[in-house]
C-alpha cells in the first residue's frame, strides 16, 4: 500500500511491479575478485517471469543490463572458468554471453524453494543436468514472429491475439529456416548416450516405438530425454 501511494498507482499495479521487479546488480570490483581466491566464477542472471507479461526488448528484461555485461566481461578476463546461471522462467538474449565465450550456461528456470540445493548438486557433479529446453531461444528478438503482438509492444493489455497460428515456437523456426541460438529440446549432459530403436509398430493411426537408451559415459550417471519429431508431407493444407 505504501509503495502504491508513493508511486501514485493502484494496489494491483503495485503488486505486479514489485513481483516482476528485479533489484539492481552491483558491479564486481577488483577487491571482490582478489577476496574470492578461486579460478572459477559463477555468475547469476535473474529475471522475473509470470502471467500477463511478455519479454520486452529492453535492458534488464530480454537484454542484459550494462552492469551485467560489465561484470561478465570482467570475470571472463580474470577467471579461468566462468559459469553463467540464468535464473528465470523465460528466454533472454544470449548473444553477449556467446561473444564472451563463457565456459557454460546453466538454465535453471523457476525451481522454487529447493532451487539452491538443486543448482549446487548440478554444479558439483552430484546430479546430471538432464533437462532440455522447452522453448526456442532465438538469436535476435526480431526473430520471434509474435513479438509485435506482445502487450508490451502493442499496448493491448486486455486481450491478446497472437497471429502465428500453428507456427508457434520451434514450428516456425524449423518450417521457415530461421536458425536459433538454441533450439527447442537443446541441452547438454555430463555424460553421453546412444539410443537404439528396438521396435516400431503402426496400429491404425497409432504409432509406437520401443527404444533402448545406453549411457556410454564412464564417469557420470544421468538421464536422457528421448525426443521424437514428426513432419507432415506437403499438401494443400498449411502444415509445419
Q: Could you describe each region identified by the protein language model?
A:
Residues 1-240:
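C-terminal non-catalytic regions of proteins with extracellular/luminal or membrane-system context
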Amino acid at each position: 500500500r505504501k509503495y502504491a501511494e508513493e508511486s501514485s498507482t493502484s494496489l494491483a499495479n503495485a503488486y505486479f511491479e514489485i513481483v516482476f521487479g528485479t533489484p539492481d546488480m552491483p558491479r564486481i570490483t577488483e577487491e571482490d575478485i582478489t577476496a574470492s581466491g578461486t579460478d572459477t566464477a559463477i555468475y547469476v542472471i535473474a529475471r522475473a517471469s509470470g502471467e500477463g507479461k511478455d519479454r520486452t526488448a529492453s535492458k534488464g528484461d530480454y537484454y542484459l543490463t550494462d552492469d551485467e555485461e560489465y561484470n561478465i566481461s570482467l570475470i571472463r578476463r580474470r577467471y579461468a572458468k566462468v559459469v553463467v546461471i540464468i535464473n528465470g522462467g523465460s528466454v533472454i538474449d544470449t548473444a553477449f554471453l556467446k561473444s564472451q565465450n563463457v565456459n557454460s550456461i546453466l538454465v535453471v528456470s523457476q525451481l522454487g524453494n529447493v532451487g539452491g540445493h538443486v543448482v549446487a548438486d548440478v554444479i558439483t557433479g552430484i546430479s546430471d543436468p538432464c533437462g532440455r529446453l522447452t522453448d526456442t531461444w532465438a538469436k535476435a528478438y526480431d526473430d520471434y514472429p509474435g513479438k509485435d503482438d506482445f502487450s508490451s509492444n502493442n499496448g493491448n493489455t486486455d486481450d491478446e491475439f497472437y497471429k502465428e497460428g500453428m507456427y508457434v515456437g520451434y514450428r516456425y523456426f524449423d518450417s521457415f529456416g530461421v536458425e536459433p541460438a538454441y533450439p527447442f529440446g537443446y541441452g547438454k549432459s555430463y555424460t553421453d548416450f546412444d539410443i537404439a530403436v528396438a521396435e516400431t509398430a503402426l496400429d491404425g493411426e497409432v504409432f509406437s516405438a520401443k527404444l533402448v537408451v545406453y549411457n556410454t559415459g564412464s564417469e557420470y550417471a544421468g538421464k536422457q530425454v528421448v525426443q521424437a519429431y514428426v513432419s507432415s508431407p506437403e499438401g494443400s493444407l498449411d502444415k509445419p
